[in-house]
Amino acid sequence: MQFLDFLIALLPALFWGSVVLINVFVGGGPYNQIRGTTLGALIVGLGLLITGFAKFNNPTVIIVGLISGALWAFGQANQLKSISLIGVSNTMPVSTGMQLVGTTLFSVIFLGEWSSMTQIIFGLIAMILLVTGVALTSLKAKNERQSDNPEFKKAMGILIVSTVGYVGFVVLGDIFGVGGTDALFFQSVGMAIGGFILSMNHKTSLKSTALNLLPGVIWGIGNLFMFYSQPKVGVATSFSLSQLLVIVSTLGGIFILGERKDRRQMTGIWVGIIIIVIAAIILGNLK
């Protein structure tokens, strides 16, 4: 593995972790954000179409791409709703942990990914680490009873719903063996359709939607870097490195967006995201 390949493999985490930061920075609310983000992803998809990466000779790729893209839009829209309630730094560690748990459980139960005792043992350790890491990143502030906070409770429910969309996006491709640049155009079309449907009954503005195009473009470029890095550094390594997005988004929420945390919460966040990343590395190497 060359050092340059390793640096490129880090870029998906940087790009994907920046998506929600830019969404919140430019504002507009979750419905403008999801419509703009999905249209931005479609711009990248159209670029792939123009350059000949989109193939129309495989109906499975087309159908799975469209459906999985719509599922991603559903997951992202609900994640943005949670962010509007409790902020980026509270949402992203929990969302990342839920996604890892959800995709892992589905893959183990329905796809039989853990076939040896060693995989089962290390997999269970990783799951325990994930739950622990998420709990640490969600520590309440001093004199704060977070469990009695109605917005926090509502956000957790929304994140569970969001996770269903994200897990569906990932596992659908695994089930049918669909992925890579061949599927990205059709996924981006599904995302744009999903984003439009999810926002069509809500007030949106052209300006706010346009400002939120950038996060979608960044998401799509992050995918391209992921596809490039997988054959260079391996699927397990590229997957593990991509989960560093939780560090980018969580710390970006605190230091860039100014979400306030006390010393106890900051300690929990630092330790929690390290534990989540360790768990992601373990899970990545079990694939």
Swiss-Prot record:
Keyword annotations of the record: Cell membrane, Membrane, Sugar transport, Transmembrane, Transmembrane helix, Transport
Membrane-related topology note: Multi-pass membrane protein
Transmembrane region(s): 7-29, 34-56, 58-75, 114-136, 156-178, 183-202, 209-228, 233-255, 267-286
Protein origin, superkingdom: Bacteria
Gene Ontology MF: a single term: carbohydrate transmembrane transporter activity
Keyword Cell membrane belongs to the record: yes
Assigned GO CC terms: plasma membrane
Record's subcellular location: Cell membrane
Entry-linked InterPro entries: Sugar_transport
Biological role: Involved in the uptake of glucose.
Similarity field: Belongs to the GRP transporter (TC 2.A.7.5) family.
Name recorded for this polypeptide: Probable glucose uptake protein GlcU
Source organism of the structure: Staphylococcus aureus (strain MRSA252)
